């Protein structure tokens, strides 16, 4: 992992622990935990928790996001649709782990996700035959699956557009996926449905924003240190060529 992600810690959501880093199915990379939270709905005045969700990101997400978002507060990021859109569509690998708190069938889960995806695509006018076929395959892959408490749906999202899907009954992360769908819109939509404008886990969004603020600021500090090192190296070269001028310049910097 990059130096600025070594401070990443685990997150516990209910009884589910999301470790600080994982190697997703179908990937050769190790991703860090961006954030995690619960998904639930209010039923008759009571909030019922259905799943715990963890979102992992490739290391290059930090410098990529820092270009636009460093210096922002956690609240600003939490409230920014564009920030989460940059995560969903950014040129980095993403991994999402959805672990059940209450039992679900594969059909229940896939149909709800598909319904949200199709509605979003139609509202944007981007629902085509390719997406319709991808949704059919998505539902078919989940058809015979069952998810008792502690079981997980695992999604590895490649920046090239593929979506690797895996299943785990005991919290472990398999090395290979159960199926791969080559549809960029669907790949992005799965994560979008969780942390997007109408995402199903506001808690995961807030946790993601809060944790990334620290990493973005650390990355900014790293950039500053690298810049200072470049200046020092430059001064060392200049010192050999023009010792008197450099000593004078260095002295002025100390005074300031």
From Swiss-Prot:
E.C. number(s) listed in UniProt: 5.5.1.6
Disordered: annotated segments: 219-256
Biased composition (Basic and acidic residues): 228-256
Other remarks on this protein: Part of the biosynthetic pathway for all classes of flavonoids, a large class of secondary plant metabolites, many of which are brightly colored.
Biological pathway: Secondary metabolite biosynthesis; flavonoid biosynthesis
Keyword Isomerase on entry: yes
Organism annotation: Elaeagnus umbellata
Keywords: Flavonoid biosynthesis, Isomerase
Name the record gives this protein: Chalcone--flavanone isomerase
PANTHER family, A to Z: CHALCONE--FLAVANONE ISOMERASE 1-RELATED (PTHR28039:SF8), CHALCONE--FLAVONONE ISOMERASE 1-RELATED (PTHR28039)
Site (Important for catalytic activity): residue numbering on this chain: 109
Tissue specificity: Nodules.
Binding site for substrate: 51, 116, 193
Enzyme class: isomerase
Signal sequence segment: none
């Amino acid at each position: 992992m990059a130096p600025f992600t070594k401070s990443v810690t685990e997150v516990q959501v209910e009884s589910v622990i999301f470790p600080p880093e994982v190697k997703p199915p179908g990937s050769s990379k190790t991703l860090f935990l961006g954030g995690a939270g619960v998904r639930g709905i209010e039923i008759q005045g009571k909030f019922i928790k259905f799943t715990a969700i963890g979102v992992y990101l490739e290391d290059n997400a930090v410098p990529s996001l820092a270009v636009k978002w460093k210096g922002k507060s956690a609240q600003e990021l939490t409230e920014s649709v564009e920030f989460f859109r940059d995560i969903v569509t950014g040129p980095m690998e993403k991994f999402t782990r959805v672990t059940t708190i209450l039992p679900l069938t594969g059909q229940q889960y896939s149909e709800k996700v598909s319904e949200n995806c199709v509605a979003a695509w139609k509202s944007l006018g981007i629902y085509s035959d390719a997406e319709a076929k991808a949704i059919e395959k998505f539902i078919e892959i989940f058809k015979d699956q069952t998810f008792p408490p502690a079981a997980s749906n695992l999604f590895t999202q490649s920046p090239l557009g593929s979506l690797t899907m895996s299943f785990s009954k005991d919290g472990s992360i398999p090395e290979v996926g159960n199926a791969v769908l080559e549809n960029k819109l669907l790949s992005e939509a799965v994560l979008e449905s969780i942390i997007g404008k109408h995402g199903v886990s506001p808690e995961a969004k807030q946790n993601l924003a809060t944790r990334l603020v620290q990493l973005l600021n650390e990355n900014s500090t790293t950039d500053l240190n690298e810049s200072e090192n470049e200046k020092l190296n430059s001064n060392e070269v200049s010192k050999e060529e023009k010792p008197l001028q450099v000593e004078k310049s260095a002295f002025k910097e100390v005074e300031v």
